[in-house]
Amino acid sequence: MASETALFFPPKQQPLLIRLVQSVSYLVLQRLYRCGLVVSDDDVAKLRAIAGARVVYVCNHPTMEDGMVLFSLAARVGQLWHYIVAKESFKGLQGRFLQWMGCYSIRRGLGDRASIAQTLSLLKESQAQVVIFPEGGCSYQNDTVMPFRSGAIQMPLQVVAQLTKKDPDVDLYVVPISLKYRYTQPMTVIIEETLQGLERTLGIIPTEPEDFYQRLLAIASLVITRIETEFGITADTEQSWNQRIDQLRHHGIAQCEQQLNLQPNGAPIRERVYKIQALLESEEPKTVAEDDALYWTTVRLLNFDAIYDGYVAADPTPERFLDTLMRLEREVYQVEHIKPKAHRQAIFRVGEPINLKHYVKDFRQDKASTVERLTEQLRATVQENLSR
């Protein structure tokens, strides 16, 4: 097994190269990612106003394109940021490029001491600016925020508590950033084509072709039933869809942990999945087929982690329809990542920066309670601004 040091990729920030890449980031975002950037002048000014301080940016993580979008936001603000990125992204030239851009790795689901130490070290530097996705991974949900992991607030609180022993007036801000996407064209035809593709593959003939929502429900119902059959679960017609989905999640994670002789630890399923993926990457494989099957189960678990019945019905926007349809495509077509269906706008809203020096006294008196309170405050702010 590789040493912990070998499993960590530190940042190797190259400022001149970053400025060069930032200068073309708008074009790259438009051409390669089919995405435009929307952020108000007031929000840009809000970020620039604290440019000379230590800052942690916490942002929700709805899609796999968020990293590039945040890099473009840094370019818009005119700043150089560091980014915490999942270790599996650091492969070959791409990995080196990420390091040059100021990214460093984290092994999700494990206590990655090297990554934590890097974050603590960076935040002790003046003008350090670090981006963290506190949900821990991609939610695939445009309008809802998953629970935040406490480390995003605990680490900067720990640093500011140390720094204020020498300088009581030291500033260290945490800034809640909300990110959502909007398609820039009518999506009716694309939704119709996506429904047709899934129906064709699953052998479904729609009884109400004009009712997109009922067609979505029919597809989802068959997909859930198929997974239940695969897992050997007898469907209980008295259960709600959310109960059935939750049962599938718990069955899937238990199956994975049993294969790896892991004891359930009560952590959220997403954290347990990341631990399994990290172990699959670092340990000697049993057989390729066994590891591939186990990895695919973890992908399915992440795909369905944040989904719930009612997400589309509550607000049937094109974005919510396609959030759900793309989840179903990943399951039916067995594809881990699906590209956006059309050009979108990435819309940022920046919350009021929180200066952690004002919470040092509380942190010293009751670390756990202070971290929990601020973590939930940040999550609620991101969700509130997302819903505006």
Question: Residues of each region from the PLM?
Answer:
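ATP-grasp fold ATP-binding core
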Residues: V130-G136
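Membrane helical hairpin/interfacial module
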Residues: L80, I84-F90, Q94-G95
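Membrane-interfacial terminal anchoring regions of lipid-handling membrane enzymes
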Residues: M1-E65, L73-Q79, K87, R113-A114, ...
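Domain-scale detector for complete catalytic domains at protein termini or as standalone homologs
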Residues: S25, F97-L98, G102
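Short glycine-centered, acidic/aromatic-flanked micro-motifs in structured strand/loop junctions
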Residues: C59-N60, R108, P134
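Hydrophobic alpha-helical segments in the ANL/AMP-binding
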Residues: D66-A75, G92-F97
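Short, basic, glycine/proline-bearing loop/turn elements
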Residues: R31-L32, W100-R107
